[in-house]
């Protein structure tokens, strides 16, 4: 079945993202390492959406909006740098650093932003820190900061932006004592 006016490749991309999220949520006890990120990209680019999905790119790539070009990815270097990032104690900082490292590294032929966002969210969810989600109205700002990050390799500004604007989760508020007692009374009624 197709959707009128939507390209098949777009439908495949959305379906692949769904499967990538399923994979990420099923793997919450696994380390965020090179192998994991390759598997995420394989999910993102599966069904022939991305050539060589899940494998390091072996050709140069260009980035839209900048003349900066990422170097060729080297597996041993990536493994070492990811292990260093994995040592960051604060899970939110670790997640944002991992996401930004991966998006700038451009390990794959395509799907690097989706893959890096999923890897960052994997760390966030595993640490109980919510999720990273760039609101649609902030996407132009995010893309501008991303280009500056590509060119400078300084993640300070974009990390602060993500931290302040792009982390969602449940906010637990402290209930006043009367409301808490009332809630306990309601629960006792169900025990009968």
Language-model features: where?
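FIC/Doc superfamily catalytic core
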Residues: 1-192
